Amino acid sequence: EHHSNIVPWQLLCERTGAVLKVVPFTDAGELILEEYERLLASGRVKLVAVVHLSNALGTINPIKLMIELAHARNIPVLVDGAQSIPHLAVDVRALDCEFYAFSSHKIYGPSGVGVLYGKKALLEAMPPYQGGGDMIRLVTFEETEYADLPNKFEAGTPSIAGVIGLGAALDWLSAIGLDAVAAQEHELLEYATAQLREIPGLNIMGTARDKAALVAFTMQGIHPHDIGTILDREGVAIRAGHHCAQPIMQRYGVPATARASFAAYNTRDEVDALVKALWKVKELFEL
């Protein structure tokens, strides 16, 4: 899980006394569903919050099955779709999740904007989380009558330009087609994985059977930040660090990883440039 699907729940637990339980995962980066079912069977689970696609490993979690298992016990499910939304075709009705959230900047839109999908009955039952203008129908000094959905959750002046920018990004990606994007990225992932495995001392983190869009790795004796710096000088942009997923780093016993993420615009030539630059990293460290 990304920190954004951990820290808010920890804050909630501090306020309410609730207990946060975690489903463990295998060395390959796959959730252990038997442990998930065991937690559900405890009878104490109030909400399942799970990432659709791991931003640190690329694992695609079996969301549909997890939702069905939770619903069999009348447990609602919130899906963190920030990483999956630009890489997979998502149908929230088919998934039948109660909530699905994603951020604009992950789908080529402006920063500071996001989307929370929720089932209408649940949203109507929920109180506003903040107050301000435009989220009201009637205000007196004695009470406030809130506006209908979705306005009651949108206090104050919204990010008008950001929302328009997000709409343009969604239109652009929809015109290409997410199925086409997924196929392109899968081909790049397969190609890159095969090339990276040829580099001695390079260890790929996360080898789930169902995976998309990215490859995270370490190189023996070389800090990921050094990898990122050298690649930057070679004109190759990757991400190096804990990727806002420190529990995953702790699970693998590493401080950080280097991560190459693929998008709709990437090509095989760029994968070749990445691999060539990684060989140069090895040369510089004389490994």
Model-derived regions: residue spans:
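Pyridoxal 5′-phosphate
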Residues: E1-L287
